[in-house]
Every structure is written in structure tokens, then in C-alpha cells.
Amino acid sequence: MDPHEPPQRKRSLFRLDHFLPFQRASSKPQAKTAASSVRKLLRRIGPTMLSSPVRRVVQTICFLSFLWLFFYVCWPYHARPHAAGMIQAGWRVAEFDQNSGGLSLEHDNGAENLRAGQKRFLVDQGAAVGRFNITGIEDKRVHLMPDAPLSAKQIDQMLFGVGPWALHETEPGQWPSHYTDDLARKEIVPAETFLIIDPLVSLSTAIAARSWVWSLVCAGVILIVCVFIPRGFCGYLCPLGTLIDLFDWAIGKRVTRFRVAKDGWWVHIKYYLLLAVLVAAFGGVLISGYVAAIPVITRGLLFIGEPLQSGIAREWHLVPPMHAGHVVSILLFLGVLALGLLKPRFWCKYVCPSGAVFSVANLFRVSERKVESSCINCNKCVAICPFDAIKPDFTTRVTDCTLCQTCGGVCPTQSIKFVERWNVMDLKAVNDPPTGETALGRRGFMSLITGSGIGVAGGGAIAATTKLWGANLNDPHAFRPVRPPGSVPEPAFLDMCIRCGECFKVCPNNVLQAEGFEQGLEGLWAPMVKADWAGCESSCNACGQVCPTGAIRPLPLAEKRVARMGLAIVDLQACLPHANREACQLCVDECHAAGYHAIEFVQVHTEVDAAGQPIEGTGHLAPVVLTDKCVGCGICQTRCFGINGLEKNLLKQSAIIIKAGEGREDRIMSGSYLKLREAEAR
């Protein structure tokens, strides 16, 4: 047998080999073939691409998919209202028949551009009464009949409406294209796909919330897959790992002054960090969002990439301002990348608690890297392994191996195989050469006990500190942020929100922004409504659709429109009409345009004569919030602050503010908001 020929492969139950076998250089000129050209190209890209091109291709596809989901599917959203069509305002009601619903309107300029047979929507101060047919025109009058019999509510609108009345060609406030439609159109796969397959996200959330989390199913599926491809998530799918690879390739390999040894106290950090995360979760505090792989990269790109995307593609004034919470998250994200200066993929090897979940799951693997007796101890596999998963005797550290198969592609004797774990045919001798790694001895046992103790104590301390400097939910005067529509009750919300920031990204107008330290560490990076910045669009329910843990329920649009986020409160001292400063109807117009009709006018500051009769021309129409209709969308606050505050400098803050709290919001774990509204109306 030629000593240069690879040994005959031994039989196995299955083989998972997909690496590109090592090819010896020949001293004789070789004809140029397509295969040799491909090998040359892969070699120029890098040794890991040449060794395991399948893995690198899968990594690239997953990373590009993550970026596509984040930067395209989640942005930009748009919705298109109906074209307003012709609007003729300034009409007065001349006659109205309650029985038939027929009415006559008159206008000083007459019925210009109107003719019998046309259909028009009758509108009072932005609120559409209904659609009417024009039955006749006489000089300055137009006669109308309703398309359908008027309801009691419509009759009341006609009887008590103060005008001015308008005739609209199209119904106001109608949207043929919704934000939610745009999301559904682009979501070939769910935008939160990578978040729901990070098992630490769902596992820690379920423990902290003491409830079932639907993404546990997805986490279970990926863990089952990784029984066959141990730590395959880390080696193939994780976009953070790929980004770290890119950082190490571009920067890390050029800066070697901070390099650390292969062995040290840090090699088991991921297990102790995982233990701390789970202990904190048992204490009712969710900290996995700080350190789990996918939330880290999602939030990092949100606070770094999304402002650049919005500023360049839209306008820089549309980028929300940053605060201390943003800085903390950005530093954490950059710190994860900077660990590569200590050692390539330091985070993935030694720190990542999501990877630790898969390492523990590796104990149940059915496949494994094996080394045959034909191994010549060349050390190439040890040098190229990205996860330090190969011992000095060239056998495998099974809890660290990701089956990336890079080692198989550099083995000159093709001694490495990826087969069932119980395959023991013709294997290399263990501990040859000596590894210096022994079974758990006294020192190892003490190290394990110490590290575990630190993990448990650290998790408990974090839980206690977070609760101590937290939301203070029992204090009625504590800060209560307005949460997204469909948010579960606040205690459960804080336990279920993973702080991934996905809901911020899909919010079309940046209504949802990251909370700072208003609720201490407990509320850090949780989504809150910033109504001074923008209001919640009535045609958008995207935040609930992308939430990976159910902290924000995925509501149908009809349910979302009646889910109360908070209640608009008018500051009577600041409101311009209430304070008798000047007339203003900004909030009323915005509320009616959104279709909520939750703010109406009352007459205030009307002067009376000696007989107690109101003096004509005195007083103002001032806004009053109808608590049974207000959902706390915040568009009234946005308009008031934008015009009266920023543009006219009449106010330091909005005179109408959305506030959350008991009796002002709907926070339910399950059930219908529509039925809740119906029950309240009875």
C-alpha cells in the first residue's frame, strides 16, 4: 500500500463529513481543472474556507439572512391612506328629518362641483357621520339621503353636532395599506427567527415569568438538531459568532499584544455565567438579555446600525436622541467584539452563556468527532480549531466541539471522521502525547465548587440588587412607563421582556424607544412609548408580531386598535384654551383623523351678562378626553408638543400627556380586548 494514500475508511452507522479533504501538493505540473481553480480561490479567501467551505457558506447565508431580517424586513415600514379626494367644507344643516335620515345643507357659495347622483361622506369636525346620496341641488342648498338607515348614534351626531360640516369624496381616516400589511408582505420568515432559536432566551424567560413561553418549542427544535450536530448553532447559525469572526479577521489578528494563554480561570466562565442567569431567573429577574448571543447583537445593531440607516436613508432629525442606557448597551456590544483581542472568538469559546446551553446539551450528542490511528501528530488540527475543542493528543473536547469540520480539511492523512459517538473502530490512542488533562481531581473539584458558588451568589446578588433598585411596583407614586399595546401586566412584562430591541426596530415612527434607568436596572432597555416623539399608528401592530417571548402579545389589528396603552390627561393649567390663552384644537383634529374620536370640545371661559346669559363671541372651545374611547396612542401629545412646544415655544411640555397606571391601561395575559370593551359598555 502506498504510504501517501489515505487509509481505507472504516464502516460506521452514519458519517457527517462535509469538509473539503486535504490535497497534497504535487511535484509534477498538474492540468488546470475547475476543481483546482475552486481550491485556489478558497485558499486565497482563507484556510478555514478551504478546509470547510460548507460551514462558511452556511455561516454567510445565516449572517446575511439576519441582516436582511433586521435592516429590510423590520424597516422601513409604510402605509398609504386613501387620497383625500374633493373636500367641500363650510356647510350648515338647514333641515334634518330623523325618520328618513334626509337632510338639507346650505353653503354661502352654493353647491359648486356637485351634482345629483353623487355620493359623499358627511363629516362633522373630522368624524364621519355616514355616506349620503345627493338627491337634488337648489341654488345654495344640497339635499341628501343616507345610503343606509341611520343608527341612533348617527342621529345623535346630526342633532348635537356643532359643525362646521364638510362633504368628503372619500371616507376620512381610511387606509387601504397598513403597516401590518407591509410587515406581512416582507416576512417570508419571521423577523424574530434568530431570537426564538436562541434557547437561553426562552428558557430564562419561562423560568423568570413562571409561565409557558411559546418560543420554547423553537428552542427545543434547535436543541434536538444539535444532538446530531453538537453546538451547530454556534458553529453555523449564530450571527454574533460570524460577526466576531469578521472582527477577528479584520482587526483581532493584527493586534496580538493582549493575547492570553490557552488555559486559565476564564475557560469555564460561560458555565458560571449561565448558572448566574438561571439563578437570577429563578429569583424573578431576567438578565439573559444582557448576555445571550442574539439579544446582544440585535440590540447592538439597533443602537449603532439603525440610527445610521435612518439618518442616511431618511433624515437625521428622525433619529431619536441617545441616553445613558444606549451607551451602556453599545459598550457591552463593543466589549464582546473586543474580547477577540485576547484570543480569536474569545466570547464564543469561554464567555457566551447561550453557547454554554449547547455545551451542556452536547452531553446528549449522538455524533462526535473521532480521530483514527493513522494520525501522524502533525498538530494542524489543533492550530486551526476555532473553538479550542481539540486536546494536545488530538482527541476531542466534546462539550466545545461545534462539528465545524475545519480540522478535517487540514488533516493530511484524513484521519478525522464525524460519526456516531459510540463508534470506536481503529481510533487513535488517548493521551498520546500526554495532554496534562486528567479527570476531576482535588484542584478541579475545588475550582468547580468555587466557580459554581460565584455563579449562584452572583445570580442571587444581581436579582436582589435589581429588585432593590428596580421598578418599585408596589409604590403608587413610582415611575410608570407607557408600554406597547398588548403588553402583559407590568410584573410579568419585566420578567418576560428580553430587551432585544426588535420591537423598536419595527416601530415605523420610533414611538417605542429604549427605557433608561427610570426604573433602575429592572426596566433598562425595555420598550416604552415616547409620545413627545411620535404617536402609535392605528394601522400598525408590528411590535407584538416580532416579540420573541410574548411580553407584547401578537394582536390582530382590530384588537390592537382598542387595547388601551394609557390615558390622555389634559393639564388644565397648561392647555391654551383651558388657560384662556388662545384657541387650539390640535389634539382634537389628530384624534379624529386617527379614527378614535376620543377628544371632544366643551365651551370654557364664556362670559355672561347681568341676566346670566352667555355673551356671544366670548370663551373658547377646549378639549376634554372621553376616557371610554381613549387608547393612549399618544398622537395628541405628539402634535401638541411639536406645534405648541417646539415650533411656537408656547409650552415647555405638551399640555396633554399619556399616563399609564391602574384604570388607565389594559394589561392582560390573555383574552380579547374587544370583548373587554364590550363588557365595559354594558
What are these model-predicted stretches?
Residues 1-393, 399-400, 405-682:
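Non-ligating segments of multi-cofactor redox enzymes
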